[in-house]
Amino acid sequence: GMMGIVSIPSIDVELPIYHYTTNEILEKGAGHLFGSSLPVGGKSTHSVITAHRGLPSAKMFTDLDELRNGDKFFIEVLGQKIAYKVDRIKTVKPEDTQDMKIIEGEDLVTLVTCTPYGQNTHRLLVRGHRVAYNAGDEVKEPTHRRIPWAHILCIMLGVFLAVDCYMLAVRLRRNKGR
């Protein structure tokens, strides 16, 4: 069943966390990697949370590669919210689990997804260490503004079409006047 929620405000993601990482579970949310620490926080813990990218039905961890060092994500378990600050972003081969080990005295969570998008030959690891929780941190800060190229292109196309129509109308009026 569901054990908690992972939320990543900077990329607008909030997913339920389920026990295990079966395909069935990853179709509906994030999975807790069996063998890693439970995502309840505490010294000398390292929880690994994994989710798919680019499912037709849901965004999941599609934009995980947009996270930067210093961004925060949150885990909510048993009514408690824990904040983590991203401190390492790394791409590894699927069998390389070195970066998922417990580090003595540390409280860590690593978010994992497949990469590169569509090929899935490697794993993107985004690690965070526990920091003090402030409710204000969960407000979505548009830190990584995506340039909406599609919108810009449509606006430019509209402007060009308007200018073109205007020029055509002017030419037609001139020709009528002769």
Where on the chain are the PLM-derived regions?
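Solvent-exposed, non-transmembrane regions of membrane-associated and secreted proteins
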Residues: 1-152, 173-175
